[in-house]
Amino acid sequence: DWVDRIAASSSNKDMKIIKMLDLVDKYEEEITEGMEHHEGHNHDEDHDHDEDTSEWDEHVWTDPENAMIISKKIADTLALADYQGKDYYMGNYKKYEKELKDLDEEFRILIDNAKRKEVIFGDRFPLRYFVEAYGLTYYAAFPGCTSESEPSAKTVAFLIDKVKTDNIPVIFTIELSNGNIAKTIAKSTGTKVLTFYTCHNISKDDFEKGETYVS
C-alpha cells in the first residue's frame, strides 16, 4: 500500500516500521443492516470473498486494550533503538498503560450500567473494535473506511425507523464531520446529536488545548 511505498523510498535504512494491524487481532470491515455500501461493493457477495480480497478495518486503536499493545511495541522499539533512554521510554509507557487501563475500566462500568447496548451513528463508523470490546451493537450510515458522504434515502429512513423502534435517545456523529446525516435523523426523531471522538483526527483547537486519547 502507499505506506509501504513511502517506507521503501526512504533513504534511512535503519528506520523501524511498526504495523499496528500485525500486532492485534483484526476484523474485516463489515456492512451492517441498513448501511450504505462501498462504491462497487455488492453485499450479496459478502459470503463469497476470502482473505485475499478482504478489506481490514484499520481503526484498531479504538479498543483501549489494543492501544496498550501498540504503545508497548512502540516503547520496546524506542528502547532498542536508544538503549540509554530505555528507562525513560518504559517509564512513560507504564504511566500511559495505567491511564489506558483506567479508561478501559471507566468504559466497562459505564456500559455495564447502561440501559441500552446499542448505538446509532448518522455518519461513518470507524469504531468496530470499540463495540466488539464492550459488547455493543451498532447501526450506521457508512462503514469506517468509505469515502462516501451522501447516504441514500433508504439508509436514512432505516436509521430513523431504528431510532424510533428502539427508543434511541442520541444520534452520534464523529469528529470533524459536518453532522448533516445525524442532524437529519435527529430532526425526524426528536433526539439529540453528540460527537463520538474516534481519536482518528483532531481539530486545531482541541490540539492546542492538549486533548489526547485519554482526555
Regions found by a protein language model. Name each.
Residues 1-215:
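Extracytoplasmic metal-acquisition and chelation regions
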